[in-house]
A protein has these predicted regions:
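Membrane-embedded alpha-helical bundles of multi-pass transporters/translocases
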Residues: 3-480
């Protein structure tokens, strides 16, 4: 039996007002500020503040990847199968996740005094798993960009600006930590907990406010279907496989990301100065997205993504050579350090492509699947891609602490040293290698599957036009 969906406005008209656009971008900014803090600093908190050993860190990273993924199997079936009312498909889920995410962010950087051993690991893993689960609901704030307008040009504009705002928001915690580090220089634990509290409060307020101000305007066929069939539709789509393989390879860069705060301490003396790594990269990412938006008017998105992978390998190799020369000279300051930070900006330019274009590819694949099957699989597509990124991400997360520190590690990082410049030369160079060259190799490999991707240009426009006609056959009467 077919359900009812909200009415779809004319697809060739501008749909999104200025206030709605701004509110949406603000909510995305503070959402990615929260997720960015976990991504940037949680490992640093566990290694240098809580001081868990490398085997505990590997176990933690494995559990917080695998367990949420298993639970998400059921969550995404609920998301894609739920009835659509006046408030839309995704907005209620973001509002549901806002408060728990803010609280869990705080708990991610707070450990009760006296906890050790098994109780400590249970506490850490429970919070990490709950964070991963709630983030599945919260992440639907990104899905909202795809359904705010049926106008293809307007949709791509929202996706582009969402990517830029996400890149900046992802670096916001770096600024907060730097400021707190100037006030409480030798108290990392306090820096982390204050940053988490501030970021959590702002995330809650803006996610709730942003969802009240936005609308969803895509018409859906609401007939209930077996969600497992939807997974099969995705796995049978050849274009989806281009994205799946690419994202699988790209997720191995988690090893490089893991090294970031530790390398910043080795180069600059303190992990709170990771801002000087993250900010140039974040600015480069935002600039890179603007460049990509301009180049999309002249070049195929597939070609741009492949070219960005080649560029990433070149830029990261250049950064490694600069950093290697600096460490070998054992210089305490000087121009090489500045040149290295400039190279981080150049590396960030590639992030503009790797963050923006896959979102556009996924939006186009969603339309291809919907045209062929009549099913809208927003959450399920991300989940299927996530199956493979979970595998590579879990491997990367488990290997990262074993590579960084402990017995038989490659880098030989020593925990608890306040001045990171006192780490050995071997440690610095190996961390630098994984942060730069290894990252560049994975980004190059991530572009290879797109040699076989054809859903661009005229083919993309043809599918979108046919889909707009198909949506006219849906029951467009509004329903609570």
């Amino acid at each position: 039996m077919s359900g009812k969906t909200m009415a779809a406005p004319a697809a060739d008209q501008k749909q999104i007002g200025t206030g709605e656009f701004i509110w949406y971008m603000v909510s995305v900014f503070f959402y990615t500020n929260m997720t960015g803090m976990v991504g940037q600093y949680r490992n640093n908190f566990l290694v240098d503040v809580v001081q868990i050993n490398q085997h505990q860190a590997a176990l933690f990273n494995t559990l917080v990847s695998v367990v949420p993924w298993v639970l998400n199997f059921f969550i995404v079936m609920y998301i894609d199968g739920r009835a659509i009312g006046k408030r839309g498909k995704f907005r209620p889920l973001v509002m549901l996740a806002a408060v728990p995410m803010g609280l869990l962010l705080f708990l991610s950087f707070w450990v009760p005094k006296g906890l050790t051993g098994a109780l400590l690991m249970i506490c850490l893993c429970t919070v990490g798993i709950l964070w991963g689960v709630m983030n599945t609901f919260g992440n639907t704030v990104n899905n909202l960009a795809v359904v705010m307008s049926p106008n293809l040009r307007e949709r791509d504009t929202v996706i582009s600006f969402r990517g830029i705002v996400s890149a900046v928001g992802n670096s916001a915690s770096l600024v907060i930590i730097l400021v707190l580090g100037l006030i409480w220089k030798d108290n990392k634990a306090l820096q982390f907990i204050l940053c988490a509290a501030l970021s959590g409060v702002m995330g809650i307020i803006t996610m709730l406010g942003g969802m009240r101000a936005t609308r969803e305007r895509i018409a859906y066929e609401n007939e209930r279907k077996n969600p497992l069939e939807g997974f099969g539709d995705i796995l049978r789509n050849k274009y989806a496989w281009n994205i799946i393989v690419s994202e699988f390879l790209k997720s191995f860069r988690g090893i490089a990301n893991f090294m970031g705060t530790f390398l910043a301490a080795a180069l600059l003396g303190d992990s709170s100065k990771f801002l000087l790594f993250g900010l140039p990269t974040g600015i480069g990412t935002a600039v890179g997205m603007l460049i990509i938006n301009f180049l999309l008017k002249k070049f195929d998105s597939r070609v741009l993504y492949i070219a960005s992978g080649i560029y990433s390998l070149i830029a990261n190799t250049g950064a490694f050579l600069i950093g290697y020369t600096y460490f070998k000279q054992e210089t305490s300051g000087g121009p090489l350090r500045i040149v290295f930070i400039v190279f981080l900006f150049l590396i960030g330019l590639q992030f503009g492509a790797s963050n923006l274009l896959p979102n556009m590819f996924q939006a186009d694949v969603l339309e291809d699947i919907e045209l062929k099957t009549g099913k809208r699989m927003d959450a399920s597509l991300g989940f299927v891609i996530g199956i493979f990124t979970m595998i590579s991400g879990t491997v990367a997360g488990a290997l990262s602490p074993l590579i960084l520190y402990g017995d038989n590690s490659i880098c030989g990082y020593v925990q608890g040293i306040q001045d990171g410049t006192l780490q050995s030369l071997k440690t610095k160079i190996w961390m630098l290698f994984f942060y730069t060259i290894f990252h560049g190799i994975m980004m190059f490999l991530a572009g290879v599957p797109f040699f076989f991707y054809k859903l661009t240009g005229a083919r993309k426009a043809e599918i979108h036009a046919k889909l707009l006609e198909q949506r006219k056959t849906y029951d467009l009467a509004a329903e609570d």
